[in-house]
């Protein structure tokens, strides 16, 4: 690679021997696209393949990447290394060809580890809350003129991206993904552990114990002087604390936390609470995000900022002005329509990425506390057959907390169908206990009228899921609602 093409002061990626051409399989994913963009801006030749075009592939094409929309052997011609998404099958023809040609095939986390190898890395891990916590930490550092590099799993509204190459060659704030165990490649200086729950356990031979062991191993990737910032409210985190041989700071609502949250109040999209720190002034926090889970995320960020000696005034101001992350309890649209009875109906649409029962329950609680008088409807798209199978009864219990539920077909994410783990099975499981509030939508053209028939005068609709449910709702509900209004 020609070092004159890149700016060493903006991103400290050293020359990777003779690596010039890097190919991404599954380049249209949020994280994969972000990594590709960083490398592209650092002077490497980038190509990639995916099934369909999206805003990520379009952006990369504009920057000079060569994108293919079919997986074929010829896509990897002249590639020096292949980076693969965890969603890509080992039977992919590009992977098979690469192995025949002895071209290195690495995970996205291996490439992230190379990008950030010589930086002061702050890694955010855990089953839930990684993306939001990463975004909050970045925003505090950015607002404090520290200009860190960011690699995140979701788009920050403030920069309309999930990555940013910082002007400061020192700090890098990175989301660490446990879903394929690839986070073990990272070597941070500080680790945040938000929580541990049963998810992606197929990666860990179906064992929750193995998942916890992986987090313990990850934390011991810290150097002897590194720090683990851990949420003590989570039971699984409590169980691994005795096995951690690194500096630990705990946080949470618990009275046992080193950094403790108290006096939490939510008013619509805003949270207010105090954060009590050891040998530091108590902080009065106004967070521009709703929900107790986001108070925890913000407090993890406060722990990091305090450790890095960021001024309290900067911390407070940044949390107050935080713009959020796309599809994380994000206000999508509001409508007022006139019904046939000439009564006005108010509709608030909120888009949320949560796809695990615990995440969904937090969304429901946040909606209930923020808007207690509104009727709560949910359009839910299950994500992956494996997750639907593993949490069938948990989903049934959690989803029963809304007033009206509309279940779409499972978003497979390249998984094969598992009998008894489809949307119909989930619908039948819920239907056994609570008959009148759940509707199965297998024909998307019927979504609009089904929702309209369930509306009251004041409604909050949660658009829930990690797949393409947001685009489905835009096409089959919002578009028709605008026509209905006119």
From Swiss-Prot:
Pfam short name (any one): Mur_ligase_M
Name used for this protein in its record: UDP-N-acetylmuramate--L-alanine ligase
Catalytic reactions of this protein: UDP-N-acetyl-alpha-D-muramate + L-alanine + ATP = UDP-N-acetyl-alpha-D-muramoyl-L-alanine + ADP + phosphate + H(+)
UniProt record similarity statement: Belongs to the MurCDEF family.
GO terms under cellular component: cytoplasm
E.C. number: 6.3.2.8
Pathway note: Cell wall biogenesis; peptidoglycan biosynthesis
An example Gene Ontology molecular-function term: ATP binding
Location within or outside the cell: Cytoplasm
Annotated binding of ATP, by residue: 126-132
Organism, scientific name: Buchnera aphidicola subsp. Baizongia pistaciae (strain Bp)
Annotated function: Cell wall formation.
Biological process annotations from GO: cell division; cell wall organization; peptidoglycan biosynthetic process; regulation of cell shape
Domain of life: Bacteria
Keyword entries, A-Z: ATP-binding, Cell cycle, Cell division, Cell shape, Cell wall biogenesis/degradation, Cytoplasm, Ligase, Nucleotide-binding, Peptidoglycan synthesis
Enzyme class: ligase
Family matches, as NCBIfam families: murC
